[in-house]
Amino acid sequence: MSIDDKVRSIVKEFKAYVPGKSKEEIARNYGIDPERIIKLGSNENPWGCSPKIEEKLLNEVSNLHQYPQPINPELMDEISKFTKMPVENIIVGGDGADEVIDNIMRILIDEGDEVIIPIPTFTQYAISAKIHGANIKWAKFDEENGFKLDVESVLNNITEKTKAIFLCTPNNPTGNVIPTEDIKKIVESTDALVMIDHAYIEYSKEEYDLTSWALKYDNVLVLRTFSKVFGLAGQRVGYGVTSKKVVDYMMRIKPIFSLTRASQVSAITALQDKEFFEKCLKEGIESREEIYNGLKKFKQLEVYPTEANYMLVKVKNGMNSSEFCEALLKKGVIVRDCYSFEGLEPYYFRVSIGTSEENERFLKIMSEIVE
């Protein structure tokens, strides 16, 4: 008998997650100087994290032999001030918001329960739901309607077995927000937990921020992260804002020390450095417009409007997305091939914001490939 006979059948169905490519990988595979590589594939903050974090981390080195605080009061207070939400309604997790997603599935899902996921969207929702025994009911962001959420495709899938509904807004990878009235209709039509993923909400108009709904509705959990505008993707800190009851259940199964000392210090400092946050947000939106307007000039591309720090692009020059992305890689540009996203044809890629210099070089290289 081999280990294959012991592994759960659902795990055998999975394919490994395909992350955005790293500079190190491209330098190694294509022989390109890492300093010349433009990384626009992982929705990161190209200006990095707050410069004040380095000193704080150095001061923390002498404490690394000690376990971190399971719940850091200072971090909770800073998140509370940032979101204007009570500490009692906040749950913080390591591994970005992924830990919050996984823990929600752990407390909600029994074998055979149902989870509704509109696609294309962030792939981790389905992975986490399936591994905990859920049956996925697919709804859709309608490609023929600019990837607007098909609300009826969500509502028509709600049954007595529905335990959770995932709504990513702005949606990854399409970049569009879900209208507030559509989300309200879904939330008020079910007692299932509606997960509103706001990983990119800082880049959107303030009116689209529904974090306060965690106090208005018992069946809402809003996901937030430090990986995007705060520039802490490498520290893996995320959090959820939800009802006190949900927080209580999650605290019962939450990993005790999932947040390291370094990640806690980094997140606290990032929230306190409001000047750097505002700078990154302002320059990020400017960068988004720069890339969007530049790509719109190419007739062989269809560029979708966005409220995030990335945009979805459809290739219409006869190449599929993998061929197109490979051509960019050979010139030292990393974007995200979207072939692995359920619900997308193999002609889409996603491009993240960059610095002005990176954007200029990227658009020049694009002109060489497209025209």
UniProtKB/Swiss-Prot annotation:
Keywords: Amino-acid biosynthesis, Aminotransferase, Histidine biosynthesis, Pyridoxal phosphate, Transferase. InterPro entries: Aminotransferase_I/II_large, HisP_aminotrans, PyrdxlP-dep_Trfase, PyrdxlP-dep_Trfase_major, PyrdxlP-dep_Trfase_small. Its EC number is 2.6.1.9. It catalyses: L-histidinol phosphate + 2-oxoglutarate = 3-(imidazol-4-yl)-2-oxopropyl phosphate + L-glutamate. Its cofactor is pyridoxal 5'-phosphate. It is an enzyme of class 2 (transferase). GO terms for biological process: L-histidine biosynthetic process. CDD domains: AAT_like (cd00609). Pfam families: Aminotran_1_2. Belongs to the class-II pyridoxal-phosphate-dependent aminotransferase family. Histidinol-phosphate aminotransferase subfamily. NCBIfam families: hisC (TIGR01141). This is Histidinol-phosphate aminotransferase. The lineage of its organism: Archaea, Methanobacteriati, Methanobacteriota, Methanomada group, Methanococci.
